Amino acid sequence: LHWSARRQRQMCIRDRSKAASPVLCRSTVLPLVHNHSLRKKEAMSSTSNSAELTSISVTPPSYRHDPSARIRAINWNRVSDDKDLEVWNRLTTNFWLPEKVPLSNDLPAWQKMTPEERNLTMRVFTGLTTLDTVQATVGEICQIQDARTEHEEAVYTNIAFMQSVHARSYSSVFSTLSSTKEIDEAYRWAVNNDLLQARAKKVLAHYFGPDPLKRKVSSTLLSSLLLYAGFYLPLHFSVHATLTNTADMIRLILRDKAVHGYYSGYKYQRGLESTTPLRQKEMHDFTISLLEELYALELDYSGELYEPLGLMDDVAVFVRYNANKALMNFCL
């Protein structure tokens, strides 16, 4: 009897579901069509509202142009340039910190290096720190005011942070491998080195200048050219099984720099599209001229560092290769 009663209840449930299913089909299909139409109308209305919102408000950096304007928040649900989201995702995927790299494993190799090799390493990394400090505090930040989209502003803040991470990473090498006296001497050398100062000031002059396109050209060339003479040394050592963990960290930095240079170059091209042929010719000539100046400075700086160890010929090839890669970021 117990089994029979349970069986009857199951049959009753199945019968009710069969009877109800046609009704469910009729009641669900029609609203789907209605909802599709409704969503389409909502999307059109939302697009119109978004355009209206943009026309009556500004992002925070634009406050300086119109203090009376309404301020709007960044909306990642409405991305006008897909490249902004693509680069943002690439940057966050690539995120790393120097504390995760086992630099202390390089200590035995460091102790076997000659005093000349260690001195060169300290100076090379201090030079890299100088340029990354320029980028983190000025180079990326100064491009925010000229951003074409609000998401571009966010990407530059992301890049600026990673530039600070890069600068921090060289200090991690110093604190792991060398003494406070050696570190202080390397920083003193960087301040007093005329070629290093000239490289930094050449781009800073345009960062603080009035031309937004020249800022982007300068930033692209710093990320794509000026740093690479410094990157050569740890890569050279790693080929000879020396400072291999430091070289792994440099490869992480190189991966970031490739994205940074590409993005600034891309935004430069987008900005150039809306200008006159005369302006495009002006910027083309400026880009080539600045690249040649920085390339010459890079060779002079590299010669001062690498000639004593007989590495300059290989470094010159490496610098020339990256100068051509920098031009590719401008489609030149």
Question: Predicted regions span which residues?
Answer:
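Single conserved hydrophobic/aromatic residue that forms the stacking wall/gate
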Residues: 1-16
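Extended, helix-rich structural scaffolds rather than catalytic motifs
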Residues: 52, 60-65, 276-332
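Alpha-helical transition-metal enzyme core signature, strongest for iron centers
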Residues: 128-136, 159-170, 174, 192-200, ...
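Extreme N-terminal leader/anchor segments
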Residues: 39-105, 110-117, 147-154
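Long, hydrophobic, well-ordered secondary-structure blocks that form the structural core
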Residues: 141-208
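Acidic/His metal-coordination segments adjacent to aromatic residues that form catalytic metal sites
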Residues: 104-127, 146-147, 186-221, 238-244
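Extended amphipathic alpha-helical segments with heptad-repeat/coiled-coil character used for oligomerization
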Residues: 184-185, 190-192, 207-208, 265-289, ...
